Regions:
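Generic low-complexity segments that are intrinsically disordered, proline-rich and/or Lys/Arg-biased
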Residues: 19, 23, 109-111, 160
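Charge-rich, low-complexity N-terminal segments
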Residues: 1-64
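Acidic, proline/glycine-rich low-complexity IDRs
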Residues: 130-162
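Charged, low-complexity, helix/coiled-coil-prone segments
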Residues: 9-16, 47, 77-91, 145-147
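Surface-exposed beta-strand edges and flanking loops
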Residues: 8, 49-51, 59-61, 88-91, ...
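A short, compositionally biased
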Residues: 38-42, 65-68, 106, 115
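An exposed acidic His-Trp-rich patch
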Residues: 70-130
Length: 162
């Protein structure tokens, strides 16, 4: 029987816990070439939340195809090293939800779920089509907004550029 790491309630609590962004978060999330891949660039940012663990935002994009990207919210529990993906905001590629047996090729968001863990699939194997972004920048801005990241005070006073 598969081991369930997080219940749906646990996942919801992790998504809604306030995560305070440092003043330099945008520069830290800027993607850069990585030695392990000549096709992708990646940026990462870790935020420690007292008594909860570490949250990691990962921005990954293809150097050639602008529709091939992911903005990921990972979670590392205290005393652990494994990253659990709680949300994944993806570009366009084919995805199949194994339990529902439906496939699509579109922008989509992966959600960590208890039932996919119980079925033995990846924690974030379930996904839904979205029209709330069309670029990597739009995807990670949505991730920050939906997953309760608190922006620095200086940024809050500035109007958001569209």
């Amino acid at each position: 029987m598969p081991v369930v790491q997080f219940s749906d309630k646990d996942i919801d609590e992790l998504i809604t816990v306030p995560k305070y962004l440092p003043a330099d978060y945008r520069s830290r999330l800027r993607t850069r070439a990585r030695s392990y891949s000549d096709k992708h660039e990646e940026g990462q940012l870790e935020i420690d939340v007292q008594d909860k663990g570490t949250f990691r935002v990962i921005i990954r994009k293809n150097r050639i195809n602008p529709l091939d990207f992911s903005a990921i919210l990972g979670y590392i529990p205290p005393e652990r090293t494994r990253v659990f993906r709680l949300r994944r905001y993806n570009g366009i590629h084919k995805h199949t939800n194994k339990i529902e047996r439906n496939s699509f090729r579109a922008f989509h968001i992966h959600y960590a779920t208890q039932r996919y863990q119980e079925a033995g699939w990846d924690i974030d194997a379930y996904a839904e089509i979205t029209d709330r972004y069309t670029t990597i920048d739009g995807a990670w801005e949505l991730l920050l907004d939906e997953c309760n990241f608190i922006r620095p005070e200086a940024e809050k006073i500035q109007p958001k550029m569209l």
